[in-house]
C-alpha cells in the first residue's frame, strides 16, 4: 500500500485499518516513509481526527515499535502514574513513596524536563550520587526488595513516538488529542504496569488549557488503556498556578520531602493525597475512603519518608540531604522580585514562571542543555494574595547575570486587580471507565 494513498484517505476523512497504521508508523521508523510524508499524514489527522478505535490501534502500533517491558518478574499489581506536565509538578517524588509504603509495587520510568515543565529524573539527580540509569536486573531487584524504583525511560521504548513527537513539535501538530493520547499511552503500555493513573493538568502551565479539553483527552486515554486490558483512571488537576512554592530541581526535592514529613504546602499535600488515593484504589487496596486513610497514615508515621530515603539510598543517592537541606549544592546568588503596586494577584501565569526558572538555569531550552540544580524560584505570593508595593513576590536563585531576563519573563505573566479572584479547584474531575465525576460544579 502506498503512503500517498494513505495520506489521501485521511485527508478525505477516511478511517484507517490497523494494517494501514502499521504501514505508516513502521514505515516511518525504518525510513521508508519520509518526514514530509509523515508530517502531511499527521496534519491530516489533526484536521480530520480519528475514531477511538483508530486511536487505540495507533497507540498499540506505536507501543510495539520498540521494547515492550515485561514486569512479570515483580509479583503483585504494579501501578504507574503519568502527569501531562506542569510547573512545579513534583508529585511523583511524593506519591510514589506513599503508595509503596502502603504495599503497592512502583516500577516507574520517568522523563527529563523540556521547555517550561520540569522532569522527575532531573529532580532526582539533584540529590548527589543518585543513579537513574539502572539495568533491567537492578531495576527489578530494587522493586522486589524495597517496593520502589524510579528510573529514566529506556531509549528503546516506543521508538516511533520519539520520532513522531520531534516532527509534531515543528509542524504545528502538537495539540492534536488523538496524537497526544497515542504518544502518552504508547509509552505507558510499553512500560508494562497493570494499572495507570493519569494526572491530566489543565491551565496556563499545562498542555491542555481548558478543563473540557483535558476531560476529552483523559476520556480517550482511559478508553485506550481499558481497550488494552489495563486499569486506568485520570484526574484533571489545576495548573494555572504552580503547585506548592518551589520551582527548580533541588528546591522541589526539598518541598517534596516536606510533604512526606507532614509539613508541606496545603495545595501540594492535598493533590498528592488525592493522586495516591486513586493509585491505591486502582491497585485494589480498598474503597477511596480506606485508601485515603492509608495514604495519610504513612505520612503521619514517617514510613513514606523512610521509603523515599530507601529508594535514593538504593540508587546511590546521599540521603543526608533529605534530612538536612543545607547539604544541597548552593546557588550562586539570590534576588528578591518585588511587587510594583498594591493589589490582589489576579493572575500569576504558571507557564511564565516556568519559563523564568528555565532562564535561571533550572530547565532546558533545548535537549541536552546543562542544568543548574540549585537554580529556581521560591514563590512568596501566589494567585489570590494581596500584596503591597515593594513586598517580595518571589526569590530567584541562580547566576546574577540571569536575574533581569527571568524577572521580565515572570512579570509578563502577572496581573494585579482590586478584587480577590475566586479560588480555583485543585482537582476538577475524576475520569474512569465508568464516566466523569466533576468536582468543580
What are the residue ranges of the model-derived segments?
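Acidic, glycine/proline-rich low-complexity segments that act as flexible tails and inter-domain linkers
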Residues: 1-88, 307-318, 434, 440-441
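Short, small-residue-enriched loops and turns at beta-alpha junctions
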Residues: 14, 28, 46-49, 85-87, ...
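Alpha-helix C-terminal capping segments
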Residues: 47, 93-107, 187-192, 224-228, ...
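Glycine/serine-rich anion-binding loops at beta->alpha junctions
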Residues: 77-100, 104-116
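General beta-strand structural signal in soluble alpha/beta enzymes
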Residues: 106-110, 132-135, 150-153, 197-200, ...
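Phosphate/diphosphate-binding glycine-rich loops and adjacent basic-rich segments that engage nucleotide
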Residues: 144-193
Amino acid at each position: 500500500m502506498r503512503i500517498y494513498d494513505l495520506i489521501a484517505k485521511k485527508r478525505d476523512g477516511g478511517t484507517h485499518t490497523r494494517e494501514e497504521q502499521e504501514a505508516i508508523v513502521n514505515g516511518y521508523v525504518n525510513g521508508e516513509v519520509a518526514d514530509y510524508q509523515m508530517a502531511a499524514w499527521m496534519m491530516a489527522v489533526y484536521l480530520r481526527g480519528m475514531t477511538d478505535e483508530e486511536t487505540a490501534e495507533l497507540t498499540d502500533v506505536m507501543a510495539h515499535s520498540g521494547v515492550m517491558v515485561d514486569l512479570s518478574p515483580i509479583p503483585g499489581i504494579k501501578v504507574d502514574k503519568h502527569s501531562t506536565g506542569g510547573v512545579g509538578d513534583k508529585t511523583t517524588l511524593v506519591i510514589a513513596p506513599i503508595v509503596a509504603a502502603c504495599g503497592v509495587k512502583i516500577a516507574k520510568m520517568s522523563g527529563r524536563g523540556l521547555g517550561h515543565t520540569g522532569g522527575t529524573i532531573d529532580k532526582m539527580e539533584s540529590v548527589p550520587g543518585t543513579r537513574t540509569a539502572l539495568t533491567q536486573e537492578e531495576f527489578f531487584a530494587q522493586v522486589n526488595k524495597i517496593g520502589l524504583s524510579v528510573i529514566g525511560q529506556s531509549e528503546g521504548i516506543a521508538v516511533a513516538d520519539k520520532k513522531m513527537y520531534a516532527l509534531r513539535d515543528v509542524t504545528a501538530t502538537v495539540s492534536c488529542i488523538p496524537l497526544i493520547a497515542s504518544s502518552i499511552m504508547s509509552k505507558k503500555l510499553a512500560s508494562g504496569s497493570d494499572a495507570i493513573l493519569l494526572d491530566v493538568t489543565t491551565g496556563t502551565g499545562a498542555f491542555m488549557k481548558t478543563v473540557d479539553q483535558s476531560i476529552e483527552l483523559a476520556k480517550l486515554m482511559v478508553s485506550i488503556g481499558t481497550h488494552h486490558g489495563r486499569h486506568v483512571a485520570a484526574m484533571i488537576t489545576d495548573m494555572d498556578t504552580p503547585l506548592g512554592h518551589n520551582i527548580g530541581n533541588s528546591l522541589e526535592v526539598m518541598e517534596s520531602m516536606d510533604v512526606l514529613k507532614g509539613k508541606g504546602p496545603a495545595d501540594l499535600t492535598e493533590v498528592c493525597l488525592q493522586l495516591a488515593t486513586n493509585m491505591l484504589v486502582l491497585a485494589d487496596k480498598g474503597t477511596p475512603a480506606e485508601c485515603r486513610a492509608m495514604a495519610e497514615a504513612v505520612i503521619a508515621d514517617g514510613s513514606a519518608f523512610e521509603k523515599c530515603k530507601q529508594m535514593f539510598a538504593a540508587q546511590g543517592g546521599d540521603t543526608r540531604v533529605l534530612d538536612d537541606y543545607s547539604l544541597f549544592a548552593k546557588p550562586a546568588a539570590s534576588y528578591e522580585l518585588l511587587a510594583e503596586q498594591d493589589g490582589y494577584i489576579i493572575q500569576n501565569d504558571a507557564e511564565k514562571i516556568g519559563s523564568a526558572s528555565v532562564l535561571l538555569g533550572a530547565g532546558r531550552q533545548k535537549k541536552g542543555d546543562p542544568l543548574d540544580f540549585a537554580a529556581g524560584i521560591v514563590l512568596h505570593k501566589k494567585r489570590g494574595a494581596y500584596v503591597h508595593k515593594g513586598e517580595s513576590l518571589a526569590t530567584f536563585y541562580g547566576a546574577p547575570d540571569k536575574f533581569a531576563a527571568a524577572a521580565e519573563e515572570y512579570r509578563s505573566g502577572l496581573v494585579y486587580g482590586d478584587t480577590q479572584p475566586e479560588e480555583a479547584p485543585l482537582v476538577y474531575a475524576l475520569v474512569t471507565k465508568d464516566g466523569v465525576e466533576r468536582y468543580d460544579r
